[in-house]
Curated annotation (Swiss-Prot):
The lineage of its organism: Eukaryota, Metazoa, Ecdysozoa, Arthropoda, Hexapoda. PROSITE patterns: GNAT_ATAT. Pfam families: Acetyltransf_16. Residues 216-244 are annotated as: Disordered. The keyword Transmembrane does not apply. InterPro entries: Acyl_CoA_acyltransferase, Atat, GNAT_ATAT. Residues 224-244 have a biased composition (Low complexity). This is Alpha-tubulin N-acetyltransferase. GO terms for molecular function: tubulin N-acetyltransferase activity. The record marks Q57 as: Crucial for catalytic activity. Belongs to the acetyltransferase ATAT1 family. PANTHER family: ALPHA-TUBULIN N-ACETYLTRANSFERASE 1. Keywords: Acyltransferase, Transferase. It comes from Aedes aegypti (Yellowfever mosquito).
Amino acid sequence: MEFRFNCHPLFRQRIVRINNSLLPTGFVAQHRREALDATAQISEIINFVGQLSAQAQGLSNPVTTSQKLRNSDHHIYLMFESNQKHGLVVGILKVGRKSLYVFDQNGETVNVTAPCVLDFYVHESRQRGGLGRELFDHMLKEENIHPEEMAIDRPSEKLLGFLQKHYGLYKKIPQMNNFVVYEGFFANKHHASDIDGRRMHITASPNTNLFGPTFTTVGEQRRSSSQTRQQVVSPPVVQQPPVGRYAAKRPSCSMAQIIHNSPTTVSTEPNR
């Protein structure tokens, strides 16, 4: 994919990483105008390649745009080929962390903040040449992660075949959302500490038939169990006898005696 401007100054290396600043890694602007021009050019590249990726996947709207990237903590890897003209952008890979509700191997719902593959595209003229593997390997090295530890957002059949061919990923854990998770996902050292505290359970409440199931975390269940144990072992409350004027005997209530048909010692005639 060639552009109307020279891409060589933007790509100081073959694969660059871009965050919400819309400036590639290794790029140093000498003045403000140069930085603004660079962000405008990177935005044009991202929007164009993102549109091509959406068309290749049969999507009506692109997953990757410069505006979405600017308003998120995700980042994009762009692959570049140098030539005698303006250079070529040949691939894009978008990744980022997202909060997901997924099923583990036991079928329990778990809330994790997981690294995800959000978009992946190599131009048709450069496919089957090893560029996709090179781009994906570069991302794994930069993110310090293994492929099975990532959730894949709405992968195409071509991407699923790519992951199986190059990384041996084929054992999927069935999910109810658009993400694909492979065995080994929950061994991820990046979010394993979040899993135990966010493992979800369905309560067996009488209100389930009326309001639907209620999900509680392991932490909430532990606190509830702890409170129950404290209530069981708490000592009985001993009521202290009243003292002073509060210990004086109160007169009987004639109205209560009349209601309950009890004899009363109070005269029915008023004192005159």
